[in-house]
């Protein structure tokens, strides 16, 4: 049985978001549902409507 995780990735670079997604989806024992966020404005909007289990954020997110 696998554990379901909702993870939000707040990162402006699509390449880095894609790399993180590839690594996270390979974790054994987890079903990963990702929310990709490219800007600080989208981050605030997303967090109002979604409650991720984990947030991975670039501290210099524009």
Annotate each language-model stretch with its function.
Residues 14-35:
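Two-component/phosphorelay signaling modules centered on CheY-like receiver
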Residues 11:
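Conserved acidic carboxylate
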Residues 37-54:
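Acidic, metal-coordinating helix/loop segments flanking the phosphotransfer/catalytic sites
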Residues 6, 33, 51-53:
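Structural signature of beta-strand start/N-cap positions in the alpha/beta core
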Residues 1-6, 16:
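Non-catalytic signal-transmission and effector/linker regions of two-component phosphorelay proteins
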Residues 57-60:
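Active-site residues of response regulator receiver
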């Amino acid at each position: 049985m696998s554990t379901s995780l909702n993870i939000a990735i707040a990162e402006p670079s699509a390449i880095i978001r894609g790399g993180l997604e590839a690594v996270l989806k390979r974790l054994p024992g987890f079903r990963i549902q990702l929310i990709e966020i490219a800007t600080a404005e989208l981050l605030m909007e997303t967090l109002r409507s979604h409650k991720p289990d984990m947030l991975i954020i670039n501290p210099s997110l524009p």
